[in-house]
């Protein structure tokens, strides 16, 4: 237990190491053992698992989804507070794969990178709605946004556009949150323009 906790950060870093697949696979084996044995803290591990769920490697993707489901079944209420961190970790992981990451993957069909995560939230309505709220609110940008901010916004928007929503309430919630965001950002932009002129 102490050994796993001591080397948790290097293992989590190794799991996301796309330049060296053997290191990535070995680290994912260690992570799997740590999670299933209860030797790692779920709050520390889940952002990495969510990032791996967006991997192009189907073995890593399914392994991460299995571990995420395992942790979600035991610690669902704890994991809600990590939505923002998980989304950003996934984006950073995608940035390590490509210069301008998108929020979808195209196999036989196009699907949102966060579809697996959304499916894990499953029947828990409040968790799904909290997830969608967090995702939508991350589209907020300041007037001084960078190219990386725009890429992140596009990554989030792709996921929102391509998620397979379960009930009508969910896209309606996204639309409502976007309206609120538009009102706030529109007012902010108007005041910036007025100050400059």
Residue ranges of model-derived segments:
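Long internal repeat-built scaffold domains in very large eukaryotic proteins
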Residues: 36-37, 47, 65-197
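Internal alpha-helical scaffold/solenoid segments in large eukaryotic proteins
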Residues: 5-75, 80, 153-157
